[in-house]
Structures are given as structure tokens and as C-alpha cells.
């Protein structure tokens, strides 16, 4: 790299004039490099507010699910922060979430340990652009609606959204039923997925994605969705599976 070669020459005692004549770099630029040797990272363009359409990115759709489930966007001095809380019991989910953040922004992710969990934190001024659902108060106390471009991405492939939502606010359990019969009590066990959220809007986003995938579901409580049919569970097992 020209920058590294120029700094190396200056460190060996070459004058600014000599290095400028050899490399074609101005003396002013060379002085600035001496003060701050590290190259400046170019500002990342925001894909949501750019002139071109947001490209289909499974990492973003997955991150959208994680944000709706366990994330928040907040202001920190002159920038914005995304914070997603992940349980320490499921390190693979934490690692996948971190990879998704890096894939979307190209920026490093900090890990802030808490009791029983870890907050993944990333600073970027454009987080409100990528998550227009951001707002004051808790999510279940305000309207949550996907923007048109977000809905288009989800329709392209709803699986990453479900994969992000399900681990954050859901689980895969084994349901056991005891049925009395003339011959005695018979026990049935079968797996099922549950998804719980106090926001009716987020529940609808989740079930709309299941509908797009042709996965049957039912509401077992006012704030909970159950997926229990054998074919539906098998479908979720194909791209979600148990937490790990």
C-alpha cells in the first residue's frame, strides 16, 4: 500500500519532500498520515436510505427477527446503538446473531456480559433507518408494522425472519398428554414449537411469515402461538430446530 510504504520511508529518515516526489502524495497528506497513521475507514452507506432498492439479504431479515424479539435501538451521544440480548445458555444463537450484525454493517460487535445473558452491541447512526419500528417505550405498547421494503424482503424468503423470532421469544418443547383408556392411562409425547410475545403486532408478523411458508399454527393463548402438527413441526425443524 502507498500509505504504508510512505510511512516506512519517513520512519527511515526520508524527508517529506523526497517522499512526496517519489510517491506523488502531497506534503500535507504525508503530515496528516504521520499524525494519524491508521487509514480512515470509509463511511458505510445506509442500504435503507440509499437511492437503490435494499438488496435481499437473509442476514438482515434474520436480524430483524432478533431485533423484534430481544433487541432495542437507542441513542448514545452522537450515534445510535443496537443492543440485542442473548441468553448465555445458547452460545450458537449468540454467535449467529453477531455474524448477522457484522454481515449487515461490516462493523465489529461488542459483547457486554450481564447476569445470565450477554448484550450484543453495535454502534451505527443508521440503525433507525434499518429498523423503523424503533420508537419510545416498549414494543408491545406501540404499533409495530413492517415497512414496505421490509415486507418485500420477508416475502422473498420468510425463513430467516422466523429463525430470528423463534429463538428470541420461542422454544421447542416436548408435549406430553395422558389419556385415560379402558385398558389404562396411555401417554403420548410429541414435539411442538411455542412463540410468546405481548405485542399483537409481532405475533401477527410471526404468523404471517408462517402463512407464507404454509406452516399451520394456532393461538393457544392471547399472547402465544403454537405449532404442533407433525408436518408443521418438521418444517420448522428444517431451518430452526432446538436452541443451541
PLM regions and their residue ranges:
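Internal intein/HINT superfamily modules and their associated LAGLIDADG
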Residues: 1-244
Amino acid at each position: 500500500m502507498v500509505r504504508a510504504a510512505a510511512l516506512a520511508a519517513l520512519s527511515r529518515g526520508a524527508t517529506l519532500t523526497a517522499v512526496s516526489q517519489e510517491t506523488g502524495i502531497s506534503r500535507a497528506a504525508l503530515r496528516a498520515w504521520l499524525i494519524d497513521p491508521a487509514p480512515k475507514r470509509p463511511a458505510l452507506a445506509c442500504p435503507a436510505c440509499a437511492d437503490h432498492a435494499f438488496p435481499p439479504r437473509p442476514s438482515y431479515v434474520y436480524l430483524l427477527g432478533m431485533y423484534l424479539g430481544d433487541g432495542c435501538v437507542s441513542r448514545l451521544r452522537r450515534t445510535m446503538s443496537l443492543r440485542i440480548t442473548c441468553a448465555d445458555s445458547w452460545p450458537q444463537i449468540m454467535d449467529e446473531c453477531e455474524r448477522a450484525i457484522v454481515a449487515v454493517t461490516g462493523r465489529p460487535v461488542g459483547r457486554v456480559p450481564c447476569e445470565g445473558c450477554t448484550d450484543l452491541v453495535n454502534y451505527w447512526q443508521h440503525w433507525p433507518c434499518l429498523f423503523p419500528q424503533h420508537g419510545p417505550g416498549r414494543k408491545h405498547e406501540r404499533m409495530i408494522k413492517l415497512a414496505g421494503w421490509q415486507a418485500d424482503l420477508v416475502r422473498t424468503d420468510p425463513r430467516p425472519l422466523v429463525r430470528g423470532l423463534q429463538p428470541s421469544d420461542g422454544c421447542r418443547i416436548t408435549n406430553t398428554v395422558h389419556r385415560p383408556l379402558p385398558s389404562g392411562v396411555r401417554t403420548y409425547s410429541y414435539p411442538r414449537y411455542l412463540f410468546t410475545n405481548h405485542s399483537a403486532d409481532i405475533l401477527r408478523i410471526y404468523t404471517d411469515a408462517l402463512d407464507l411458508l404454509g406452516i399451520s399454527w394456532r393461538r393457544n393463548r392471547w399472547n402465544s402461538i403454537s405449532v404442533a402438527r407433525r408436518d408443521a413441526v418438521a418444517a420448522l425443524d428444517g431451518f430452526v430446530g432446538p436452541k443451541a
